Structure formats: C-alpha cells, structure tokens
C-alpha cells in the first residue's frame, strides 16, 4: 500500500523543509517527490500546517507498571522499590500486565512515541498488547539473580527471544534484562553473559542510577557498577544501560570503548532525586545517548516531548552552558539516537529506505506562533497533545488525533477492573 503525506514541513538532516511530500510504500519511506499526483497513491493525507518528525523512541520503559501511576510518589528509589513497588508486584499476572501495557501504548501513540524498550515481567502479555496496538518494541524479561525464580526467569527470557525476536513484521526485538548489579550477583551476570553470547542477544540493564548503588558496589567489589560489568564481560554484547547518573571518567571511558549505549531518563531521575547524568561528557566521548521516560510509576507520564524538553533544559543549567543540549540535539536524542540504542540503523530519520515510523504534529496551537524556528518550537513549546497522526512500520495507528488500533473505552474499563484486583491485596 502506498501513502502520500502531502505538503508537510519535513524535519530532515537537522533542517525544516516546508511544503514537502513523503511517499510511504509498505513499511518503508520510498521518496520525497516535488509534484506528486494524488491518483498515484492508495491514500493521501493532507499535511498542511503539520510538522513531520520521525516517530519518537522511548529507550527505557516498564509499561506494565503504568497501573502504579500516582500510587507511590515523593519517595527515594530504594524506599519506593522495597516498600511500595515490589510488594504490589507480587500480585501481578498476565491479564493485569496486558491492560497496563495497553494503557501505556494508548498514551505513547497519542503522544507520538512509536518505539519503546521494555524490561519487566509477563512480557508475553506486553508483547501481545504491543502487537495489537501496532507498536514497535524491544522486549526483555526483567531478571533478578537474588529472586527465587532467577533460573526460570532466565529461561523465560530465552523463550521470549525465540517467540518474539523479529515478530510483528520485524517490529519486535528481544533483549536480556538483568535488572541491576544490586539484584544480580556476579555469578548470575556470568550466566546472562553466556546466554547473550550463545544466542547473540543484546543486554538492557540499569546501571549507576543512585549514588548509594555505586557506593555499595565499591564497598562490596572494589569496583563501580560499570567497571564490575565490564570485568564480568557483560559489555562484550551490545548493551543499553539505563540511567548512568553516577559515572566517573573511567566509567565513561569503558562505556565508550565497549560501545555501551545509554538510556537517559531525566524526568524519572529528577523525581526520584537520583541526580543528573553527565550526558555532555558521555556524548562528547562518543557514547550514543537516547531518551527514556522510565515507568509511569516514577515519572509519572510517558511523554517523550517532556523528556526532550527536560534534556535540553537541565543540562544547560547543570553545565552553565546554553549550548549544552540544543533543540536539534534534544530531538535527535528522542529519535535517531534512540533508534541506535535499540539496535536500528534504518530508523529514526525521515530518509528513503528507512522504516516508516512517522508522526505529524499540528502546528496550529497558540504555542506554535509566531513560527521563527519549528525545531525550537518542537523541543521547547511542543507537547504530546499536538500530535495529529502516527504511522508505525507504514501502518496508520492514529489519524486526526483518533487512535485506530486501540479501543480506548474498553481500555479504561479494563484498567479500572484490573486495578481494583491488583490493589485489593494492599
């Protein structure tokens, strides 16, 4: 099927090209004709007053935790995990995670997010919800070596890989999800490493999120979490490290040498008082840094426009440098850099031959005027409610701000039902 996105403002190569046209053929972007004829295409979408951006890439999520939104706020990370989140997680099941995930995907699509990278439990349920919604996703079974089900969870991750890697017309990839060094002892990390090497599976892990995590690791092993994982050989496989807030120069050197990608979660890190990651140092060292929301339990929304704006603002202030993260760099972190974090080299840019994950942003709002610079407006003034049309893998999943793949009324009803079930134990 061929689709023409007609007369859009096209974001390409860091510039805006007004009155452009995008032709999508199947799941790929085909061309950018100057004078297209409507009758040559199966469908034509009027892009007047629309800004075309690559679909946003959320590099670190726990979508099943969306049902924890507003349940446990204003707490430090370990208090939040140990006393609030982990006890409730004991009562999760496939049905609860499916509808929590579907709620997350409705929010993501509505806000222009087309790809997500998730680590959690009941990941088949997450995958089924993502497939129904039409999302693109990297799935990982969260692994905790200190858990009674440590071995079975690792086997679940292998089965997840066999079932979902490459599924959904190529929309899904599978990663291994060792939670963190403080939940995965060295011997368990070695098991994860060996399986990663055997099946050629990339890694998704939390690292250096808090100062306490780093201090405890130094006390127990004499190494930072980054140095410990490197010492154990985990970084021999492609690795996406979430957070990396408390990393030193040697950590950054290791990450750059081993091509470790970073999922920067500014909103979650600020809310949990974890700190501000040294993103400028990492990027200047050649490390690929994408953006993530973390879960709705710790953010509390899955809004990549908010994360792009935060990424641009906090690093300016933290470095006393107005050029620290520019509007363009913030958008690129939310698109092309995020796509690289997920293992793609044909996603995150609007170029011929690239996967057709495209969003059209309505520029008619008051906050889009006057329009001197649409790139700056997208990064600093735009918000998720501006998104009008969303395409994933060449398929329309939202048009005229209406979700096409998700029954929102049913989602709200099912979320109400499973939330009552989940919290009946508390």
Identify the residue ranges that each predicted region occupies:
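Catalytic core of soluble alpha/beta enzymes
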Residues: 209-233, 237-239, 244-257, 270-281, ...
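Active-site gating loops and adjacent loop-to-helix segments of metal-dependent hydrolytic enzymes
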Residues: 67-99, 106, 133-144, 211-238, ...
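Active-site microenvironment of metallo-dependent hydrolases
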Residues: 1-20, 24-25, 30, 34-38, ...
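Alpha-helical scaffold segments that flank or form the walls of functional sites
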Residues: 69-135, 156-167, 416-425
